[in-house]
Swiss-Prot record:
This is Conserved oligomeric Golgi complex subunit 6. Residues 16-25 have a biased composition (Polar residues). Residues 1-15 have a biased composition (Low complexity). The gene is COG6. It is found in: Golgi apparatus membrane. GO terms for biological process: intra-Golgi vesicle-mediated transport; protein transport. It comes from Coccidioides immitis (strain RS). Residues 1-27 are annotated as: Disordered. It holds the Pfam family COG6_C. Its main location: Golgi. The keyword Transport applies. InterPro entries: COG6 (IPR010490), COG6_C (IPR048369), COG6_N (IPR048368).
Amino acid sequence: MAAGSPSPDGMPSSPHMANTGSTPKPTALFNRLNAVLSTSYTDPDIRDSLETLDKRGLQNTAETRRTLRLDIQKEVIDSNGSIIQDFGKVAEQLSRIGAAISHLNTICEDMRQHITSARQETEPVLEEAAALLSQKQEVETKQHLLDAFNKHFVLSSDDISILTSTAEPVDDRFFQILSRQKRIHKDCEVLLGGENQRLGLEIMEQSSKNLNSAFMKLYKWIQKEFKSSNLEDPQMGSSIRKGLRVLAERPTLFHSCLDFFAEAREYILSDSFHYALTAAVSGDRLDANAKPIEFSAHDPLRYVGDMLAWVHSATVSEREALEALFISDGGELVKGIEAGISSEPWSRINDEQSVFDGEKALKELVTRDMSGVARSLKQRVELAVQGHDELVTLYKIMNLLAFYESTFSKLVGHDSALVEAITSLQDFVFKRLEAVIHDQIATITGDPSGLIPPDDLSAPEFLTDAIDNLVPLMKAYDSSFRHDITDDTSQNENKFSPIIRATLDPFLDLAEKSSTALSNFTSRTIYQTNSILVIRDAISPFPFACATHLPRLSSTLTSLKTNLLDIQHDFLLRETGLQTLTAALEPFMPKSTSESSTGNGLSRNLADIASLPEFQPESLSTISQQLDDFLPSALVDATDNLKRIHSPGLVKNATEEAVEAFCCDFELVESMIVGADEAREKMSVAGTVSSSAAGKEMDEIAALGETSGQVGAWSLRVLFPRTTGEIRVLLS
């Protein structure tokens, strides 16, 4: 490209640029273009300026572009001029306000001077008025205090008359005034806490007199109401109940009223109980459908049950009637008695009884009301039981008494006379039951024939009768509320333990004593086993009976099983003839392990077995034949030996164990016989060799040969061929 020719972008190029390749020198137009191009049109000022120009509706002409700056400056000057005019008006208004404020300050100063002069003139009058108002307020306060004091601490003459005069009735007005007087008496403690206690002492003395007179009036009124009211119905009127609650603040007077009430109710309830025993009533008229309780006197259980049911009904009614006095109305009576205990410390029974228990007081009052009935009940139950000797009925009466003991304990407490009477009756019935059993034992022991065991060796009749009497008792206890869940493995005492000991143990001891009449050991063992089995079978369904007696019975039965095993074992040995052989072989039995391990001595001894009388051919053959004859019917004969035992399972077990012991004995005898034959053969061979070496005579050799031939012909094993395996098969 030539120097001074235009560049491709239209800009002239200089030789210097062409030669050196450097950037051109910035010019004013270049700078302006760079400034325009670098301007960000997102700038808020630029955007606002453009929007303003757009709103003016200017045309983009050359004329407009030349005059735009001048037009804008003219508009700015006009705006500034209008602002200056407006500020001039504001300055004029401020001048007017300043003049008004100055005028107001002058007026305020004049008023201040007038007020100061007026205050100086009225200040003495105001001070005097303030002093008078203060005195008036003090007088009014004292008047209010005096009125309040009189209203709170002083009773009017009419109120005192209502409170203390016996001519005035005891009504709600009386109780209101009494409550106010008690409040006055209590509030006097505040007066006694001040410096001047005279007023408090005088008011307290007067209030104490009024209270004592009021409580005495109330006490006499309640006594009068008790005498005039119908005590057949223990329900008290609301006024009497309220009076008793108030009177409870004087424990001495209160207990005096309750004593009168309890004595009256005791007499009435005793009379009602006697009337129920002799004549049934329904209201004021005779009830033809109801009969006197005495009509069932022939049946002690029903008789006692009817009496207890009547006593329970009367006790429940008495408690419900008296609950309104002690428990209801939010415990007002309890609060009154607690206040009375505080006011009369000497009324406490002991130092610990500082809190009144309404429930306990209720139970004590019910107990006092029912004490006469309890005495009559105790006498009549004792008479009914004393002439009865049926064990089941006696136990059911005991169970019935136990039920009512639990019931009455919840109603009147464990320490009440009624519960104590029933507990005493239970002891009396139990002693009567023991007496009946002692009479039965005396009757049995008095007749010697009654102690002779039966021919079939079954349980004696007196024992079965005792069990027949015991089973209904156990069933009754099992179905009763007294039944405790008893673990079969537990040996703890339960409520039935005294009964079963009283009704069973004497007869069990008597049965054991009667077994001494049997001289035969087998018969005596069978008899004792049958007696134990019949008792065990009877008590087994009842865990509470098993808990105390099954361990003793099981121990005795285990001992008897051992005796039965010995009996069966001896029977098998005796009937098979093996007893003779075992007795003869006893000296040849190894005494110790060391001796049994010595081969020579044992063989020499075993060889001597053939010389025993029991092992001679004739005797051994007889025993072998006796064994063969017995084996086919051995199990049947052994079972028949114990057939009088009333437990096939027990007989079977004893026989099986005896058979096992017999097989062990037979195996021992068999091994001894085989050992004897082997020992004899060894001795025969040893004798022959010794004679040849020593050069003995021929007749001795012949004799030995003859003896050796006899040993072969006379073998113990040949004469006694049975094996242990055969015995086990035949006895299985």
